[in-house]
């Protein structure tokens, strides 16, 4: 059954706003929802709890939340249009609160527009912004900013939209008008700025488009890349691209716990099964028509 949750001004337990940008399921199976008017928590699938940002940050500033993450060690990260908020929580309340923003002397960030927050296999946290990629240094609680280029210098991760680490430990970065960049993590952290691999919309091994919205890894380790109205699947062993499917608009892309890939567009949801065999550009899949736009899934 599908349950539709909406804001109701008469009900304190309803979600605070009907514009939902992000959702996240934590290790206790609570569902956290980021909206235009704050954060909600659905505890054990029974009700939402509204938490206003000022209760966490002790500030009257707002933040339209587009990305959320709880790390494996329990840290919380929330980012959107006004920087990045970090905190931990225990019985005494919210601890270690830091708000990373442009021009902040205490906690500077390369850009206030946060697109993605990601924890890699080593437990390191990466943040994609409209001015490159940031790496969180836990020892100093500061960010290191990276902008990666292709060998020609024409394309870069200046507008970074997504990041992930593959099973070989390499870092994959997707950017607006830049394509996909791949390089060794240690080399990136050492200061190297030229990608080992780069994918654009040109050449024989091209993506379907240059604007990369999202990237996810399936259960076989393949990297799925969304470019507006198409999906691409990259084999990490031979680095070959297969253009998978046409769609209305690829609004959201995610992998489930079994490694299947889920895609939401303006009218439907499609699941590409990780166990399916690849025959040309045909993948085993199933589509459900829902008749409305998919903004996020979790």
Where are these regions (language model features)?
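Carboxylate-rich, polar loop motifs that coordinate divalent cations or form catalytic acidic clusters
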Residues: 1-298
């Amino acid at each position: 059954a599908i349950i539709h949750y909406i804001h109701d001004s008469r009900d304190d337990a309803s979600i605070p706003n009907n514009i939902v940008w992000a959702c996240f399921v934590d290790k206790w199976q609570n569902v956290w929802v980021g909206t235009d008017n704050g954060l909600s928590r659905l505890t054990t699938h029974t009700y939402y709890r509204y938490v206003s940002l000022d209760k966490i940050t002790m500030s009257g500033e707002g933040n339209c939340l587009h990305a959320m993450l709880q790390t494996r060690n329990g840290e919380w990260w929330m980012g959107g249009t006004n920087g990045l908020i970090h905190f931990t929580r225990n019985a005494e309340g919210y601890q270690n609160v830091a708000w990373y923003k442009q021009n902040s002397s205490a906690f500077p960030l390369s850009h206030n527009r946060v697109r993605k927050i990601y924890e890699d296999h080593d437990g390191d946290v990466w943040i994609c912004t409209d001015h490159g990629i940031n790496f969180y240094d836990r020892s100093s609680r500061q960010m290191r900013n990276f902008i990666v280029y292709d060998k020609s210098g024409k394309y870069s991760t200046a507008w970074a939209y997504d990041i992930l680490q593959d099973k070989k430990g390499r870092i994959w970065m997707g950017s607006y008008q830049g394509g996909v960049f791949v390089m060794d993590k240690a080399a990136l952290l050492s200061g190297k700025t030229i990608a080992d691999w780069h994918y654009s919309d040109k050449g024989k091994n091209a993506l379907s488009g240059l604007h990369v919205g999202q990237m996810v890894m399936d259960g076989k380790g393949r990297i799925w890349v969304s470019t507006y109205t198409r999906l691409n699947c990259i084999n990490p062993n031979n680095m070959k691209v297969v253009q998978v499917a046409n769609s209305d608009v690829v609004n959201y892309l995610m992998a489930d716990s079994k490694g299947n890939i889920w895609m939401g567009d303006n009218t439907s949801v499609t699941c590409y099964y990780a166990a399916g065999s690849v025959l040309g550009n045909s993948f085993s899949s199933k589509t459900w028509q829902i008749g409305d736009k998919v903004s996020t899934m979790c």
